[in-house]
């Protein structure tokens, strides 16, 4: 009794780990027999108490937390708001994912924290509450899912499933929640997909790898080991003790100069405490990694046996023990994943809350604006930020730590307990994160658009990946795409606007901008027409823009009877100010038949020459600078006398003399040769020398007086009649005779060849323009005139190898003066440019302007006054080209009346087109409650209020102009005083004083802006065009400004109306006083680091990959936790994502280490160092998985397994070819020994083999054949002549021999020792005899 009274009584709960420690200490003190007796008494006591208590578990014991209902409702509300922000384009997919995880994780964690107080208050002796904290079966997390909620789950790939499980097992799961739960919870049939039998199969594979590892020697003699640092703060004391206890030291340990522990001494708990207290240097311990043989292991490298606490005995099968030690807890890992597997976890951040109500103030210079990981605007502070909250009488100071987010603005009023800052989590969580990719898919079909914040050039050649340097929006503009395989692309033109119900099937329909009888025309005071610059009979237009001139190549088909021959360019020229006067040249054409490559002189008979400077019948010519002056010639032919001209500097060395005769390719200077032969004439002009070469024949006349006194004459060809024929034939061509006088007063005649040009009727340029253009304006004239660009007798000199144009055909615009157009003195012309993926088309628009107000009425309908309303019968045909519509296209477009836009593929071929129809647009308005200051709004034309804009009203033939009928229906007049009518004789100055015209702009699908202004018809920059709802002079208050082409997100309030904010997101394409037309679009937010797939303007379909985000996420307790993750590591499957910048990091590290060591660092990393680091990394990964599940395994068991899967190397092609074949797998120690024996360098590569491959690459083919692929293994072994030395357990077991472990090892050991004794005896006798 006295001894029992001295014992200490511990009144505390003992868990499973504490019981293990007690049993270990009992074995040390009392031995195995007495310890087993004590444990029997503990078992009896436990069963007796459990029987007495008689706790039962029923479904009524599962008590649901009362606050769960409103917590889940609040989480759903936050998720709904988050979904709206994502739809509006405020947050991207990754930010939505992160915030969704945190919302549901915080809700689930709050329910788990509320679970214990709820049980304690309502039912402290609840069986569920007692069992969950006893440690016998279950834990708080499992009970939490019984009475709380699971939250978000993961799919088999580890990706989050958006639908959270809100129900618990007490309430019952829905069918969807049950299926989602099955992925991680391993229930039912779903469990077969993840193989519950992995635990047993893993044990078998582990034993196969290490079954031959037996302790065969006491010491292998190695001097190597691994180091363990006792000062490592990242390693807890418990893990340090588990790592060191039972090991053997590989080196002596010193404290100063004193040796406290010698080598080859095993480490007990006493030595470990001394190491921790003295903080010694790193300790080198022996390990199975450093043992000198792979087929067995020594006692000192293994250490103490965990059974009895002493060094392991010889003959012990430590390999099988290691395999079972790792495989057996796999059943526990599988069971532990039953409830908690697959639950997506996250970390809740720490928040700083306001202590009271007041206004917050801080130093803005110490904080920088940024985005939080949830996409919210915030300020990031890099240093301690002092925040002051001023209330009525009290000032509160709050210190925000560095790298935290401030969630409020300066001078903002905050309420008490409001979150003002978020403290970023520590860096210790970085080890638990991994980089993953998330693909964002397009939700709709349409056209991709992005801003200048995105690199338009692909990152790599022949790639469609673009890098995002700044945060930007991607927009998918709505539109319907159709393949055009069945339609001839030469018939279907880009930017055609089709209305299929008005076009017959498979019928050719040739239509221009203004056709048919029931047209809409302008009043006589204003003429407007617009037409293509080429005829419908020509092919598609590709134009080049040079300054203010457009060069348009086209194909001749019938004009010169040349089939599809590419002819030179027609240039349509518009002045910079856009003003064209009468008799102005509108277009010109350079005929190639009047083009020459050589210099010369033009000669012609001047029947009528009109200079462009004449006042009467003025022909205004704006040509190229070289052609001055220009002449209009009324002749039918002219002559061209060729000659070669060279302009040389004074310093040039001329190698020919004046008046000399040279041949072809005669050197003129050091670097020039003549192209023709003839007479050389040298003339000095100012600082230049002009050298001419006249080709022809030279004649020396006998009598000078008989020669004509003309200095130069043209002689026509002689006509010679043939004998016995009435026909005559030209004997010679035209000749030019020139009188030459030399310096010595010698005379001779030079007869030069002449080229005759007949000016015939050239191309009728009028035919290239639609005839309806002239019908619309009766007195409009277009006439063709020929211009000779050089004067009579003027020298024509070419520049280098450029050709010289002699005649130019011009198209002159003119109109007759009559009563209707007496005051029209000028016309306004402009080009409309349409660019579609590199395909550029230009259209010409001309306005004959008299006054600045115009009215619209039907032709021949004087009863109609003012403006007409829109109806189907008044609609003109607006297709500027002919098209053939086949039946399938008509069916596909029967519900889609819209404008066509061609889409080009990579080969610049039209393969599909997109149609912008009414269903792709949204009308916002009307804005009827907008107030005016002393102003009255007049609607000139009433439109039917519909949320869908009729595309035929808003978009014209190119998408850049509405129909003529409704051209001015978009104008609204605001006046100081109400005016009942507008008189026709209203003068311009009065109009300016009376009216304020609100301009209307329109934009097509190609983002070109059209402004129907009578004065300036240029294409405007969409980013500089702003428009107000009302003229600023009449606004009572400021309204938001809308930019044409601007992208507007959904739920954005543009103007204060009864209709509320904008209901749709898209791009502004129509702006009117009463409404704004928006092309529907879906926004996608992308942040820096994301990659965009596709090109600008490319057509995307629903489901296509749009953006790829790369982000870090916490490793969740997904389906690969526990046993499957251990299997992944042991089979050497990749479970970590490799950093995409790994190569750049290695290059940077290589540069730095080269400067330090003088050699690249890669030469320092050999195969041996790589194997050592890989072994340590694999051991740590496996231990991390088991420790996370509460399972403790000694490192030596894992080291034996890892040692086997890392002991093979791959022979390189350039090494040991005389011993091993390239690509052969051999042991590492075997390769090293062979290299030492051959005395040559060893070339091999490290290799990590999984446990399955290692089992099939052993020294025993019997062991391999009994594991897998029996026939293949035996056949290869027979062909190779392999020998099995029967060193392992399995092969001896198969053949019925003695297993070389335990007593069997002793028998083998006795045989080998007897042989060794005999050998020693013989050697001893030999030595004794040698001494005699």
From Swiss-Prot:
Its cofactor is Zn(2+). It catalyses: RNA(n) + a ribonucleoside 5'-triphosphate = RNA(n+1) + diphosphate. Its main location: plastid. Zn(2+) binds at residues 220, 291, 298, 301. The keyword Plastid applies. Binds 1 Zn(2+) ion per subunit. Its EC number is 2.7.7.6. The keyword Zinc applies. GO terms for biological process: DNA-templated transcription. InterPro entries: DNA-dir_RpoC2_beta_pp, RNA_pol_beta''_euk, RNA_pol_Rpb1_3_sf, RNA_pol_Rpb1_4, RNA_pol_Rpb1_5, Rpb1_funnel_sf. GO terms for molecular function: DNA binding; DNA-directed RNA polymerase activity; zinc ion binding. It is found in: Plastid, Chloroplast. GO terms for cellular component: chloroplast; DNA-directed RNA polymerase complex; mitochondrion. Keywords: Chloroplast, DNA-directed RNA polymerase, Metal-binding, Nucleotidyltransferase, Plastid, Transcription, Transferase, Zinc. DNA-dependent RNA polymerase catalyzes the transcription of DNA into RNA using the four ribonucleoside triphosphates as substrates. In plastids the minimal PEP RNA polymerase catalytic core is composed of four subunits: alpha, beta, beta', and beta''. When a (nuclear-encoded) sigma factor is associated with the core the holoenzyme is formed, which can initiate transcription. Belongs to the RNA polymerase beta' chain family. RpoC2 subfamily. This is DNA-directed RNA polymerase subunit beta''. It comes from Lotus japonicus (Lotus corniculatus var. japonicus).
């Amino acid at each position: 009794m006295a001894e029992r009274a001295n014992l200490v009584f511990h009144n505390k709960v003992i868990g499973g780990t504490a019981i293990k420690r007690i049993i270990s200490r009992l074995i040390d003190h009392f031995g195995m027999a007495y310890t087993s007796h004590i444990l029997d008494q503990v078992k009896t006591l436990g069963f007796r108490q459990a029987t007495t208590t008689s706790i039962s578990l029923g479904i009524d014991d599962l008590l649901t937390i009362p606050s769960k209902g409103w917590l889940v409702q609040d989480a759903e509300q936050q998720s709904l708001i988050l979904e709206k922000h994502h739809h509006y384009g405020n947050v991207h997919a990754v930010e939505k994912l992160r915030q969704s995880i945190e919302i549901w994780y915080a809700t689930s964690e709050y329910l788990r924290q509320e679970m214990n107080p709820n049980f304690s208050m309502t039912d402290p002796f609840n069986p569920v509450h007692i069992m969950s904290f006893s440690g016998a079966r279950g834990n708080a997390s499992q009970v939490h899912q019984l009475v709380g909620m699971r939250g978000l789950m993961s799919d088999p790939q580890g990706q989050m499933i958006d639908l959270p499980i809100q129900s618990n097992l007490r309430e019952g799961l829905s069918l969807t929640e049950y299926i989602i739960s099955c992925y991680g919870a391993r229930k039912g049939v779903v469990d077969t997909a993840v193989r519950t039998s992995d635990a047993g199969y893993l044990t078998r594979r582990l034993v196969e790898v290490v079954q031959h590892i037996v302790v065969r020697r006491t010491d292998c003699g190695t001097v190597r080991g691994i180091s363990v640092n006792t000062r490592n703060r990242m390693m807890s004391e418990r893990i340090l003790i588990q790592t060191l206890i039972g090991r053997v030291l590989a080196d002596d340990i010193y404290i100063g100069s004193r040796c406290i522990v010698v080598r080859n001494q095993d480490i007990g708990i006493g030595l470990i405490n001394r190491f921790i207290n003295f903080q010694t240097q790193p300790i080198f311990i022996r390990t199975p990694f450093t043992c000198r043989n792979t087929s067995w292991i020594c006692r000192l490298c293994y250490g103490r046996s965990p059974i009895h606490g002493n060094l392991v005995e010889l003959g012990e099968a430590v390999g099988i023990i290691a395999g079972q030690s790792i495989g057996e807890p796999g059943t526990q890992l599988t069971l532990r994943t039953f409830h908690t597997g697959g639950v997506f976890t996250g970390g809740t951040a720490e928040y700083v809350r306001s202590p009271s109500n007041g206004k917050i103030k801080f130093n803005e210079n110490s904080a920088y604006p940024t985005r939080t990981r949830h996409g919210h605007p915030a300020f990031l502070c890099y240093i301690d930020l002092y925040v002051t909250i001023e209330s009525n009488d009290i000032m509160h100071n709050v210190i925000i730590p560095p790298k935290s987010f401030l969630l409020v603005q300066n001078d903002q009023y905050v309420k008490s307990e409001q979150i003002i800052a978020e403290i970023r989590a520590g860096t210790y969580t970085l080890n638990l994160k991994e980089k993953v990719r998330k693909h964002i898919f397009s939700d709709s079909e349409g056209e991709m658009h992005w801003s200048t914040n995105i690199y338009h050039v692909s990152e790599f050649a022949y790639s469609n990946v673009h890098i995002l340097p700044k945060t930007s929006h991607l927009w998918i503009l709505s539109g319907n795409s159709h393949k055009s395989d069945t339609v001839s692309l030469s018939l279907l033109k880009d930017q055609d606007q089709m209305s299929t119900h008005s076009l017959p099937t498979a019928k050719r329909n040739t239509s221009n901008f203004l056709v048919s009888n029931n047209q809409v025309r302008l009043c006589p005071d204003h003429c407007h027409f617009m037409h293509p610059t080429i005829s419908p009979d020509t092919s598609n237009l590709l134009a080049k823009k040079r300054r203010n001139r457009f060069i348009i190549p086209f194909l001749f088909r019938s004009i010169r009877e040349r089939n599809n021959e590419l002819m030179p360019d027609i240039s349509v020229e518009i002045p910079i100010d856009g003003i064209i006067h009468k008799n102005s040249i509108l277009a010109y054409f350079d005929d190639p038949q009047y083009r020459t490559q050589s210099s010369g002189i033009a000669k012609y008979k001047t029947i009528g020459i009109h200079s462009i400077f004449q006042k009467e019948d003025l022909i205004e010519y704006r040509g190229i600078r070289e052609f001055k002056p220009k002449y209009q010639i009324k002749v039918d032919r002219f002559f061209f006398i060729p000659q070669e001209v060279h302009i040389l500097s004074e310093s040039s060395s001329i190698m020919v003399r004046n008046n000399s005769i040279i041949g072809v390719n005669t050197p003129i200077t050091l670097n020039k040769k003549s192209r023709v032969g003839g007479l050389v004439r040298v003339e000095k002009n100012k600082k230049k020398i002009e050298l001419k070469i006249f080709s022809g024949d030279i004649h020396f006349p006998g009598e000078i007086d008989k020669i004509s006194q003309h200095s130069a004459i043209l002689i026509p060809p002689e006509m010679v009649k043939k004998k016995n024929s009435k026909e005559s034939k030209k004997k010679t061509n035209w000749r030019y005779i020139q009188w030459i006088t030399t310096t010595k007063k010698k005379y001779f005649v030079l007869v030069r060849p002449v080229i005759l040009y007949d000016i015939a009727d050239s191309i009728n340029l009028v035919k290239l323009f639609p005839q309806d253009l002239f019908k619309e304006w009766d007195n409009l004239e277009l006439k063709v005139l020929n211009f000779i660009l050089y004067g009579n007798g003027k020298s024509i000199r070419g520049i280098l190898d450029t050709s010289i144009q002699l005649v130019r055909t011009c198209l002159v615009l003119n109109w007759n003066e009559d009563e209707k157009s007496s005051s029209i003195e000028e016309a306004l012309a402009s080009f409309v440019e349409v660019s579609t993926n590199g395909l550029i088309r230009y259209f010409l628009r001309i306005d004959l302007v008299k006054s600045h107000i115009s009215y619209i009425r039907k032709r021949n309908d004087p009863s109609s006054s003012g403006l007409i309303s829109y109806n189907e019968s008044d609609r003109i045909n607006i297709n500027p080209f002919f098209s053939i519509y086949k039946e399938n296209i008509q069916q596909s477009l029967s519900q889609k009346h819209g404008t066509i836009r061609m889409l080009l593929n990579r080969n610049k071929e039209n393969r599909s087109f997109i149609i912008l129809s009414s269903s792709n647009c949204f009308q916002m308005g009307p804005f009827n409650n907008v107030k005016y200051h002393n102003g009255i709004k007049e609607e000139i034309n009433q439109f039917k209020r519909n949320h869908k804009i009729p595309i035929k009203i808003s978009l014209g033939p190119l998408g850049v102009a509405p129909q003529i009928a409704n051209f001015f229906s978009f104008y609204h007049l605001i006046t100081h005083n109400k005016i009942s009518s507008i008189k026709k004789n209203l003068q311009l100055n009065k109009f300016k004083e009376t009216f304020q015209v609100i301009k209307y702009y329109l934009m097509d699908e190609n983002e070109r802006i059209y402004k129907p202004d009578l004065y300036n018809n240029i294409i405007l920059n969409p980013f500089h065009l702003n428009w107000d709802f009302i003229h600023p002079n009449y606004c009572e208050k400021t309204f938001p400004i809308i930019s044409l082409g601007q992208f507007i997100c959904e739920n954005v309030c543009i103007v204060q109306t009864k209709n509320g904010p904008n209901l749709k997101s898209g791009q502004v394409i129509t702006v009117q006083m009463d409404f704004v037309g928006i092309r529907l679009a879906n926004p996608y937010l992308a942040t820096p680091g994301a990659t965009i797939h596709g090109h600008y303007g490319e057509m995307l379909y629903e489901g296509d990959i749009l953006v790829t985000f790369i982000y870090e996420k916490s490793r969740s307790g997904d389906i690969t936790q526990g046993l499957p993750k251990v299997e992944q590591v042991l089979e050497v499957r990749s479970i970590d994502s490799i950093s995409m910048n790994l190569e750049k990091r290695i290059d940077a590290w290589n540069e730095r280490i080269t400067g330090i060591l003088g050699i690249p660092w890669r030469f320092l990393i050999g195969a041996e160092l790589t194997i050592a680091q890989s072994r340590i990394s694999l051991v740590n990964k496996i231990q991390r998985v088991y420790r996370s599940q509460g399972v403790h395994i000694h490192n030596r068991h894992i080291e034996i397994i890892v040692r086997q899967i890392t002991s093979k190397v791959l022979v390189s092609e350039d090494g040991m070819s005389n011993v091993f074949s390239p690509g052969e797998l051999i042991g590492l120690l075997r390769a090293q020994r062979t290299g030492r024996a051959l005395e040559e360098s060893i070339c091999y590569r490290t290799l990590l083999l999984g446990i399955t491959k290692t089992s099939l690459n052993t020294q025993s083919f019997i062991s391999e054949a009994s594991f897998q692929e029996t026939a293949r293994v035996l056949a290869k072994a027979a062909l190779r002549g392999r020998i099995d030395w029967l060193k392992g357990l399995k092969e001896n077991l198969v053949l019925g021999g003695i297993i070389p472990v335990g007593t069997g090892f002793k028998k083998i050991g006795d045989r080998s020792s007897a042989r060794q004794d005999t050998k020693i005896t013989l050697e001893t006798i030999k030595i004794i005899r040698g001494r005699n």
